[in-house]
Amino acid sequence: MVLSQRQRDELNRAIADYLRSNGYEEAYSVFKKEAELDVNEELDKKYAGLLEKKWTSVIRLQKKVMELESKLNEAKEEFTSGGPLGQKRDPKEWIPRPPEKYALSGHRSPVTRVIFHPVFSVMVSASEDATIKVWDYETGDFERTLKGHTDSVQDISFDHTGKLLASCSADMTIKLWDFQGFECIRTMHGHDHNVSSVAIMPNGDHIVSASRDKTIKMWEVQTGYCVKTFTGHREWVRMVRPNQDGTLIASCSNDQTVRVWVVATKECKAELREHEHVVECISWAPESSYSTISEATGSETKKSGKPGPFLLSGSRDKTIKMWDISTGMCLMTLVGHDNWVRGVLFHSGGKFILSCADDKTLRVWDFKNKRCMKTLNAHEHFVTSLDFHKTAPYVVTGSVDQTVKVWECR
């Protein structure tokens, strides 16, 4: 690299200043003579400490360059994988991106369930500390605590209007809350053990619950009476979820099976057995996902012309399975989590599956290609629950680390 005469002169004066100010008198006088520097007080002041300044700023710049290079590489990666910088992606393909928008603390024990409100910009979390907390997911503000259960709250569910919230607990009860006045309006007794799951039926008239007593019960919202009991599981029933029109309910259990029941007749329509450990979670496929599922699995459209219904299940065997309920067949198995799978659901766009697990991650799966396309190290401890907002670009997760995290999708 060639320096101009002026640059060379400046460098020489800076070196001379460095030698003199650090007491290298002999070297200074020899250097001054050889570099033919005339002594000029004014000029010398200008170059005082210049060499050290240049030296440290070069190191600072190097660090900055390295930071920018790594950011550029990240952006390139996002671009090639169709990230936010690529062609403007369809909201149907938005996925959660790190870091989280908010990490919300307040619970004093592990968080067991997180759900979004169907109408307002709030979400609700349940915890082993026996409370339910309400948060604003847009601002990250804590709003209130609902108290009433005397043991771990295991699951929560809104009706479609968001005016009613159901909760269930290890205290063996199910509670119904008026979500406008935040009062408990009804408590239902009837299970003989920990109630692990609850869901309000799509019509809003009934609630279903699942328990460690091996049964599933259906309750009337108006009266709080138990109107049906579904029996068949041989162990603890972990989760129960109705399909979109409320004609079927799916359940999963420690007996390693997933069952699908016809609500009207209480008959077990399907018993799905391929998991090799406790099945922790289930989720129905929305109709928006049917075309991608059919493409991915080549599943034939039935004579009725309507595919499905399809169901997802997540297990302690670390896998996620997709089932065709009409045939009882397992259509695919997604492998990638390193620990128990605790939550699974379809992306509202219908092309992806989201899951969370005890390996502390939140994962996004491109199920058409049966691959995990994004892994987020979501929490410091097991991730117990997740929910995906139906219309706003947010995902929420809850964890044994006692926090609730809000993730923005783009």
Curated annotation (Swiss-Prot):
Entries under Gene3D superfamilies matching the protein: 1.20.960.30, YVTN repeat-like/Quinoprotein amine dehydrogenase
One GO biological process term: cortical microtubule organization
Disulphide bond pairs: none
SUPFAM superfamilies assigned to the protein according to its UniProt record, in alphabetical order: Lissencephaly-1 protein (Lis-1, PAF-AH alpha) N-terminal domain (SSF109925), WD40 repeat-like (SSF50978)
Gene Ontology, cellular component aspect: 1-alkyl-2-acetylglycerophosphocholine esterase complex; astral microtubule; axon cytoplasm; cell cortex; cell leading edge; centrosome; cytoplasmic microtubule; glutamatergic synapse
Predominant subcellular localization, coarse grouping: cytoplasm
Superkingdom as given in the UniProt entry: Eukaryota
Coiled-coil region list: 56-82
Presence of the UniProt keyword Ribonucleoprotein in the record: no
Domain LisH per the UniProt entry, residue ranges: 7-39
Residues in WD repeats: 106-147, 148-187, 190-229, 232-271, 274-333, 336-377, 378-410
Alphabetically ordered keywords of this record: Cell cycle, Cell division, Coiled coil, Cytoplasm, Cytoskeleton, Developmental protein, Differentiation, Microtubule, Mitosis, Neurogenesis, Repeat, Transport, WD repeat
PANTHER family xref list: COATOMER
Annotated function: Regulatory subunit (beta subunit) of the cytosolic type I platelet-activating factor (PAF) acetylhydrolase (PAF-AH (I)), an enzyme that catalyzes the hydrolyze of the acetyl group at the sn-2 position of PAF and its analogs and participates in PAF inactivation. Regulates the PAF-AH (I) activity in a catalytic dimer composition-dependent manner. Positively regulates the activity of the minus-end directed microtubule motor protein dynein. May enhance dynein-mediated microtubule sliding by targeting dynein to the microtubule plus end.
Subunit structure: Can self-associate. Component of the cytosolic PAF-AH (I) heterotetrameric enzyme, which is composed of PAFAH1B1 (beta), PAFAH1B2 (alpha2) and PAFAH1B3 (alpha1) subunits. The catalytic activity of the enzyme resides in the alpha1 (PAFAH1B3) and alpha2 (PAFAH1B2) subunits, whereas the beta subunit (PAFAH1B1) has regulatory activity. Trimer formation is not essential for the catalytic activity. Interacts with dynein, dynactin, NDE1 and NDEL1.
Swiss-Prot/TrEMBL domain comment: Dimerization mediated by the LisH domain may be required to activate dynein.
Homology family: Belongs to the WD repeat LIS1/nudF family.
The protein's name: Lissencephaly-1 homolog
Organism whose genome encodes this protein: Gallus gallus
